Each structure stands twice: as structure tokens, then as C-alpha cells.
Amino acid sequence: MPLNVSFTDWNYDLEYDSVQPYFYCDEEENFYQQQQQSELQPPAPSEDIWKKFELLPTPPLSPSRRSGLCSPSYVAVASFSPRGDDDGGGGSFSTADQLEMVTELLGGDMVNQSFICDPDDETFIKNIIIQDCMWSGFSAAAKLVSEKLASYQAARKDSSSPSPARGHGGCSTSSLYLQDLSAAASECIDPSVVFPYPLNDSSSPKPCASPDSTAFSPSSDSLLSSTESSPQASPEPLTLHEETPPTTSSDSEEEQEDEEEIDVVSVEKRQPPAKRSESGSPSAGGHSKPPHSPLVLKRCHVSTHQHNYAAPPSTRKDYPAAKRAKLDSGRVLKQISNNRKCASPRSSDTEENDKRRTHNVLERQRRNELKRSFFALRDQIPELENNEKAPKVVILKKATAYILSVQAEEQKLISEKDLLRKRREQLKHKLEQLRNSCA
């Protein structure tokens, strides 16, 4: 851990020293000073302002975060692997074996040739990417790794131990190498930040199985133990997969937010998603956010009854008036009860719509009853009995005239009845006189 802190501070100082001419106007002529000595490099921005954009069209891929397997430091460690006798155990590898192991671990397509060059090469130092302020940390990391390897090599020469002990010490030294390399790899740029989409279409990583990988079991065991014991290493055990960008905390948070999408159709609260297992890493609990599930309204289907006003009314029904009124009242009450069965939080607009709908139903019932009354009145008038298209005004006039005529006939019949009663009384009195005279 102290090595990592000192490396970070030293890296920041180195980057500040490399980009210090950027912040002073009087030193603008010294921009890309080493590039002016080479004819192959583009000119400084002071000569032509548009020449400073002549970088690579696409930035190179950042070093992989999988314990620094693709970085040049891993190649240096592989070349500096402790060697012993041929019968000394699993730590004795020849140069051909080491190259074969690197080829099997990384694969021919995954090895970037720009990262396997010598860090001390002159072309590597004069590279514009190394001198750029954004990519200068890579050269600093490589230089730091080379210095550490030189110090470890000097310490290895000073130590004198027998071959079995030397083999065990070689494993521990390689574990220290991998620990420092994993710490340096953690300072690299995450490829998922630069490239948000994976480089290949494989959704799940597949382990690279090779029959010759079992020959290097001791070194792989030491690699796993050193990776698990290192605090800067990833919490998962080191496995060889295809080159896919690792899942960071931001990606996990985005996946969790995608799982918490709200269903706007249902009124029930969405159950919080299952908590992720805490066995992955102890820092995973710090990134987890409490799921929020707001209450949403449920869609309510309001049934509306459509009536065909153009259809002619059925006037020749044999139903009595009382029975028809009872059926219509029952139908209206059923419609009102169905309209009130809307199971949703009622607002002022909903209540107003219900009142308007109820008023329309009652008004329609009143008009139908009035129309049936006119039809019944038309049937009672002798002149309009067979006229189904008689207007209401004619029905009212004919009904009034018919009522007046009926009333006049009634008065005539009442007066005639009175005359007949008087005649009856006279006849009864005359009959009594005749009986008395005969007696």
C-alpha cells in the first residue's frame, strides 16, 4: 500500500512536469521540444495551429485491468521469472516455455504489439503518445516497474540460498511482482470508460482451455494466491477469459437502475429487486442504492352507452304503461350503479363526469316517457288513430277538440238524464193516484 501511494504522488508530479510548458505563454515555443529534433514528428503548434491535432485518428486501447497481463510490465516479469535447475520444481522455465505461456494466456489476436516494445527504446520515448499529457502515466508506470525489477534483481543476486528454498523464494518474489503489477494496473484507465460497448459480442466470458495449461500449475497457484492476498487486486479469483471490459461500479449501478423500471399500468407497488450477494466485494454495499417504487394510478375503463337516435321507436308494443315504466326505471338504476363501480381515486373531474352522465340518462328517460305519452294520446283520438307520423302539435290540437266535444256530449247526456229522472218521478206519482182510486 505505501508503494502505491508513493507511486501515485510521483506520477502526478511527473505529469505536472511534463505538461508545465502548457501553462506559460513565454514557453510556448518549447512545446513538443523533443519532437522538433525529429523530422518525422509533426511541427509545434506555434508554427501551425492546426498541426497539433495531427495525432492518431483513434486513441489506442488502454492497458487491460486484468492483473496487468497485457502490459509491458507483465512481459518484463515473464522474462525476469526466477529460474533454477531443470529438476528444481515448477519455478524453472526456459525462454521458449515463457513465450509459449504468454501466447497461451493472451492469445495471438489479443497481444497488442505497441505494448511489447522495450520501454528504454528511443522510438518508444519519442512517441507522441508517451509525451502527451493524457498518456504520460503509462510511461511513468513502465519506468517505475523497470526500476522495481532492477532493485529486486539486485536483492536476488545478494541472497544466497539452496535450490529448494530458492524455488519457494522465487514463487514469493513472483507474487510480490504480481502484487505490484496489479497495483499499477489499477491506476490505468478503465477501457469501459473510453469504450462503453464491449469489443466482442460474447455476453458471458468463456475460459480459454488449453491442454498445455496444466503444465504450469505451480505458477498459476501462486498467481491465484498472490491475487487474492493483494488488497489492490480484484475481489474475484484470477481466471483467464476473453478480452471483455470489466464491469465497474458505475455499470452495476446502471444495471440496477434498469431493473427498477416502473410499470405504469399496475397500481401495486413494485417489489424491490433481490439484493445482490455480498460475497463479491466488501465495497459493493457502498454503491448499492435503496430501490424506490412510487405508487402509480391504475387505468380505469369507463363504460359508455351509445344510443341510436335515428332508429324509429317501437310504438306497437303490447306492454302496459306501468310495466314499461318499471323496466325503464330498473334499466336506469342499473346504468347508474354500473357507472359508480369505477374503482379508482375519484377526483373532481371524475365526479363531474359522473353527474353529467347521470343527468343525461335521466333526461333521456324523461323524453322517452313523454314520447310514449304522445303516442298513447294519439291512439285515443279517432282522427289520428292510424296516423303514425302525426306531429305533436296536431296531436295536442286534435286532443283538445276531442276533449271539448266529449265534454259537450257529456253535458248533453247529463241533461237528458235529468229529464228522464223527472219523467220517472211523474209517472210514479200518477201510478199511485190510480191505485188509490181503484181501491
From Swiss-Prot:
Organism: Galeopterus variegatus
SUPFAM superfamilies with a match to the protein in the record: HLH, helix-loop-helix DNA-binding domain (SSF47459)
Keyword Lyase tagged: no
Lineage top rank: taxon: Eukaryota
Function summary: Transcription factor that binds DNA in a non-specific manner, yet also specifically recognizes the core sequence 5'-CAC[GA]TG-3'. Activates the transcription of growth-related genes. Binds to the VEGFA promoter, promoting VEGFA production and subsequent sprouting angiogenesis. Regulator of somatic reprogramming, controls self-renewal of embryonic stem cells. Functions with TAF6L to activate target gene expression through RNA polymerase II pause release.
Acidic residues biased stretches: 251-263
Annotated motif 9aaTAD, positions: 100-108
Example GO molecular function: protein dimerization activity
Chain positions found as N6-acetyllysine: K143, K148, K157, K275, K317, K323, K371
PTM summary: Phosphorylated by PRKDC. Phosphorylation at Ser-329 by PIM2 leads to the stabilization of MYC. Phosphorylation at Ser-62 by CDK2 prevents Ras-induced senescence. Phosphorylated at Ser-62 by DYRK2; this primes the protein for subsequent phosphorylation by GSK3B at Thr-58. Phosphorylation at Thr-58 and Ser-62 by GSK3 is required for ubiquitination and degradation by the proteasome. Dephosphorylation at multiple sites by the PNUTS-PP1 complex promotes MYC stability by preventing ubiquitination by the SCF(FBXW7) complex.
GO cellular component labels: cytoplasm; nucleolus; nucleoplasm; nucleus
Region annotation (Disordered) ranges: 201-364
Localization per record: Nucleus, Nucleoplasm; Nucleus, Nucleolus; Nucleus; Cytoplasm
Phosphoserine carried by residues: S6, S62, S71, S81, S151, S159, S161, S293, S314, S329, S344, S347, S348
Protein name: Myc proto-oncogene protein
Record domain bHLH: where: 354-406
Assembly and binders: Efficient DNA binding requires dimerization with another bHLH protein. Binds DNA as a heterodimer with MAX. Interacts with TAF1C and SPAG9. Interacts with PARP10. Interacts with KDM5A and KDM5B. Interacts (when phosphorylated at Thr-58 and Ser-62) with FBXW7. Interacts with PIM2. Interacts with RIOX1. The heterodimer MYC:MAX interacts with ABI1; the interaction may enhance MYC:MAX transcriptional activity. Interacts with TRIM6. Interacts with NPM1; the binary complex is recruited to the promoter of MYC target genes and enhances their transcription. Interacts with NUP205.
Gene: MYC
Keyword Nucleus: yes
Site of covalent link Glycyl lysine isopeptide (Lys-Gly) (interchain with G-Cter in SUMO2): K52, K143, K148, K298
Glycosylation-annotated residues: T58
Record's comment describing the protein's domains: The 9aaTAD motif is a transactivation domain present in a large number of yeast and animal transcription factors.
Keywords from the named record: Acetylation, Activator, Chromosome, Cytoplasm, DNA-binding, Glycoprotein, Isopeptide bond, Nucleus, Phosphoprotein, Proto-oncogene, Transcription, Transcription regulation, Ubl conjugation
Comp. bias (Basic and acidic residues): 266-278, 315-331
Feature: compositional bias, Polar residues: 335-347
Bias type Low complexity, positions: 210-238
Pfam families the record matches: HLH, Myc-LZ, Myc_N
Residue ranges of the motif UBR5-degron: 355-364
